[in-house]
Structures are given as C-alpha cells and as structure tokens.
Amino acid sequence: FDGGESQHTAVMLQPYADEPDALPDYQVDEKLVKAAVLKAQAKGVDTHAHNYGDATVRTYLDAVEAARKAYPDSPSRHTSSHNLFVSDQDIPRFAALNVTMQSSAQWATPDPTMKRTAGIVGEDVAFREQFRHNSVLKAGGRLALGTDWPAAGYAVTYRPLDSIQVAVTRAILPQYGKDQFTPVLPPGDECITLDQALKAATIDSAYVLGLEDRIGSLEVGKLADLVVLEKDLHKIQASDISTTKVKLTMMNGKITHQEQ
C-alpha cells in the first residue's frame, strides 16, 4: 500500500524529521484499495496489505471498518503487514476490527538501521510507535510473525527462532555483534512473552493463511508439522533462543531433517 521510511515513501501522519517537505503518496491509489477491500469482504476473500507508515495503517483499518460494516457476516480475514509505526489511536482497532498485525519481528532491534530510521521519522515518533506488538496483544488483537524474506533489515535472516527471540528481547541477535545504540529497541515495553511469541509464530500465523484447522498446533487430526529442539525454550535465557539447535523437523508426518 505504501513504501518504506528509508526512501521517504512510507505514508506518515506527521512530516519526516529529516525531510519535512517529503510528502509521499500511496503506492496504490487509496480509493482503489478501499474498493478492493470492500469487494473482497463482499466475496469472502481475505486481504493482506503492506503498511509501513502510521497513516497507511490507519487508512487500511478505515477500509476494513467500512467493509465490515457493509458486509458484517462475511468470513473475510484481513491482515496488516509490517506495521513499523502505529499510532496510539489505532492500537485498539486491530482487535475491534479483527485485523491481524503481521510483523517481521527480527527487524525490531536497536541496530544502525533503526538508529537511522529514528533520524528519518524523528525519535519522538520512532521510539513511541515502532513494532507495537505488546500493545496490540494487550488490547486483545492478534499478532502473527513472518519473515518478509528475501527482503531483509539489519538482521539478514528468515529463521523463526531469530524472530521469536527478538520479539521477546527487542535486542540485537548475538551473531550480529553488539553494534547497538541502546540495549533494547524503544519502546521497551513492547517486548512480549515467549508464549506470546510462540503463538504468533505458529497457530496465529496459520490463521492468517486460513489453515489453522490443519497446521499451527499439535492436535489430533492435524498434520504432523513440528520441530524438536535441543532445549526447552522456557528453561533457557531469552538471549539463547536463536542459537538453540533444531534436532528434528517433521512435515506432514515425514522427517525432513534430523541431526545425526
């Protein structure tokens, strides 16, 4: 729906701090997006929108709200992707409109890229609105973790354990050294629990795909998609999650990886 803050193409509610005259427009016409969401809702089709800026997030939520009101019985599922910046006003709307917040959590680290981002949008915005995972969950919303691979931020990774660790710590992964401007990416209270991160990486991601009845949890009748780790993640330090070895991987009941 929009671009990214580093190119000044994310649509924001306030001017860019480093280029106040930069006034980006949506990558896709706003009226077209609203019409598409409405039509999808009417047909029972899901939507998934790329929303970086806080203004783009709001416009997409507005589109979903109008569609929900027009066709309240539709089974359509709507997902807002990325959500780098979300304003306080829009946090409760994710739950109210049953819109999933999809996030590439491995990006939420206090690395040089995020420091540059703070200079672009302004620290007051960045350190208040970035990756608001905990706020959405506390308001009753749904969070799903995804990679956005092969796109990459400072952390060039698609590994689920990397994303889970960063969602819990908001700190740089150990394999990327200590090139950080602060121990935890602000706002620090947006860290989530391990159980919340695991849920976001499994059953709630399956929900986004419309496959929660087949995958995403270990239940009788579902596909045997699972991993066996060398350690119980609940019994180790959060900073060790990403380096925990995968002993076995199974898909559809078939072993696809096994450590010898």
Residue ranges and their predicted role:
Residues A35-T47, A55-H78, H82, Q89-P92, ...:
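His/Asp/Glu-enriched, well-ordered alpha-helical/loop segment
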Residues F1-D46, I91:
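Active-site-adjacent helix-turn-beta-strand microarchitecture at beta-sheet edges
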Residues F1-V11, N98-T109, T169:
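Non-cysteine beta-strand/loop elements that form the S-adenosyl-L-methionine
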Residues E259-Q260:
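Extracellular/periplasmic ectodomains of large secreted or surface enzymes and adhesion receptors
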